[in-house]
Amino acid sequence: TVIIEGENAVDAAVSTGAATDVFVTEKAAERFAHIVTACGYMDVYVHPITDKAAKHLSDTATSTGLFAVCRPVLWTAGKIMAGKPKLVSVPVLTSEPGNAGTLIRTSDAMGADGVIFAGETVDPLGCKVARASAGSLFHIPVARDPNIKDVLGKLRSSGMQVLATAADGEVDLADADLSQPTAWLFGNEAHGLGDLQDEADMRVRIPILG
């Protein structure tokens, strides 16, 4: 099980059936009354807690006072690929929880069928990741596989083209052929994709227009 905090993350966990228990302060129960009400419909136990207890549970300076205990929702890369996905995000060696959550949220927003964290990465089920994902962690399949080569093998055996994001990519995003099932490789915050770019079918640059 994992403990998450915050309105969006807890709301998503409750509405998708991932939450088993919710812990809430008196003020938070009033502020997030709609979530407390939803717990009743979803058979989620609601436990009142003190502000002091909330501070101990929280990993932020200012606690929202709203927490949920959730069942693990981590998929396997194989299970995601078994669904014959058309679009998959593959963050590689992601070390920052906030970035991991943002990648999950962005993947959810762009209609991806799954996210596979490849290599030694941050725990995608962590509280900070869940909060940064703004609830998307419970809306899209998320997997973690420490073997990057194995992940690439699964992608290719499923017939997906593998594209690498690169600032000096030879193809502009607007010109890339995205008509076939596609997996996007996203590099580490500090070192990018490095030599892993050579494993991709194409290196694509995403211009920042502004």
Show the residue positions of the predicted features:
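RNA substrate-binding interface of SAM-dependent RNA methyltransferases
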Residues: 8, 15-18, 40-41, 74-75, ...
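N-terminal positively charged helical leader segments and presequences
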Residues: 1-63, 161
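Structural motif
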Residues: 24-29, 71, 92-93
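Active-site/ligand-binding-proximal alpha/beta "capping" segment
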Residues: 163-210
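Short, acidic/turn-prone active-site loops that include or flank metal/cofactor-
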Residues: 27-29, 51-53, 75, 120-122, ...
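Glycine-rich phosphate-binding loops that contact phosphosugars or nucleotide phosphates
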Residues: 68
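Short, glycine/polar-rich helix-capping loops at beta-to-alpha or helix-loop-helix junctions
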Residues: 31-35, 122-129, 191-197
